[in-house]
Amino acid sequence: LGRLDIGKGYVVEDCRNEAPVTLATAQAANNLLGGIAAYANGENRDTPNTIRNCENRGDVLADAPVSDKAKTGQARMGGICGGTAVFEGNTNYGKVEARGGGKGASEFSIGGISGMIAHDATGCRNFGDVLNNTGRENLLAHTGGLFGWATLAFTITDCALDADVVSTTLYNYDGDKGTTADPAHENSSCAGILVGRIKSKIEVTVESVK
């Protein structure tokens, strides 16, 4: 599935993918890639969408996240979904990897389940390695075994991870200038076993994770 903008509060359920998913040509902004769905339009706080009981066994690869001229925009990718949703009972077995050219997006997020989380996740499993190997100059990079970047309060319950989480991406242009929106995290690379980066001042609960 590509970008789903069909409404709010819908469910993607019981889907399975065994084919590789590759992004070889990208735009300067809003690059989204996932084993089940690229983008589930799930960033609304009150009426999020749900991805439930889905399984991905195909490798997810972004080989050219953005063009060399790009300095702004977003790139999000995950074994299940690029963007966020409510995640229930999803499993990823495929390797999730970003590599290749360009200065990169101002925000680059990669996770074993999703590049972004803003709602609860229950019963999710990731067994695919998460590799952020673009090797070039992005500004904000978030690499997580389950989720790349958390932006709203959430709870992770009964989730599991058995995979390598590696980030070798460099972030080193205009780093001394900072930004008005996020001066503390300008020129930062974050990697975490569960979540790559958690936005400040949000409530996070982790229960029964192994």
Give the positions of each predicted feature:
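Surface-exposed loop/turn motifs in large extracellular/passenger domains
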Residues: 1-210
